[in-house]
Amino acid sequence: MTTVRNGRVPQRRIAETVAAEIRDAILDVEDYRLPTQEQLVKDFGVSYPSIREALRILETEGLVTVRRGNIGGADVHRPDETSAAYHLGLSLQAARVTLRDLAAGLQMLEPTCAAECARREDRADVVVPALTAAIDTSVGFVGNGVEFTHSARDFHDLVVSFTPNVTIRYAVGSYVALWSAQEEAWAEARTRHGEYPSEIEAEEAVRAHRRLVEEIAAGRADEAERLARAHLAATQALVLDRYGDRVVNASAAMSRQAIQSIRRSRI
């Protein structure tokens, strides 16, 4: 067992203890504001080096950003759907996970969210109006490949965001955001080359969305899940035909933007 000389607690251990308390505050208090280093020194009764080390620990975890220079201070970043999706995406990218693998995972998970929407007792008042509005918006972008893809993906994001189970919403929402980023990159590339699918195919996607909303409104969960899976497979095939063996890319600017657009929880 390692002993501490002169009975003093190592600075690293002090910093970890301070970091643990600040971490708990960030996670437990929604609008937590980090005190100044001077105040933290007083609150914890420790040295400035220990406080700075604690902040470095939290910064590596993505919970704070320490501002250097004359301004100083630190900004708090409370974890949410956006950060969950981004870090998951980086993990998949590091593991060299392909778009084909991500698509297969979504095939198993996303359609169940459509079924859960159909089981909500308040679906007629909460879910259906929002999904219908999203479809109506996408209709206005038929003929504009990039904008239509973005709007159509927003519909998928909404379906997941209305899933009552928080754990499923966070997990599946992260995968949906990652896929959306890849599909939007595909749309931009195909549009530049004049190869984006025809307006007829875009209109078919709109019809598929409307049929799905009809099943959700009627409370037919099994049929909603079946339709969602069939539609998802059809739209994924367009991307996988060219990019199926590419590795998920969460670090690209477009991917980060798509992930940041994840909708907040909708219960």
Each predicted region: which residue ranges?
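Hydrophobic side-chain positions on well-ordered alpha-helices
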Residues: A25, F141, V160, E215-I216
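A ubiquitous short alpha-helical element
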Residues: A94-D101, A118-D122, V139-G143, R192-E201
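Short linear motifs at protein or domain termini
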Residues: M1-M108, T112-A115, R119, R246-V247, ...
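Sparse recognition of residues in long alpha-helices and their boundaries
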Residues: E38, D122, P129, Y175, ...
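Conserved amphipathic alpha-helical segments that form helical-bundle/coiled-coil interaction surfaces
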Residues: L106-A189, A208-H209, E223-A237
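C-terminal all-alpha effector/ligand-binding and dimerization domain
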Residues: S180-I267
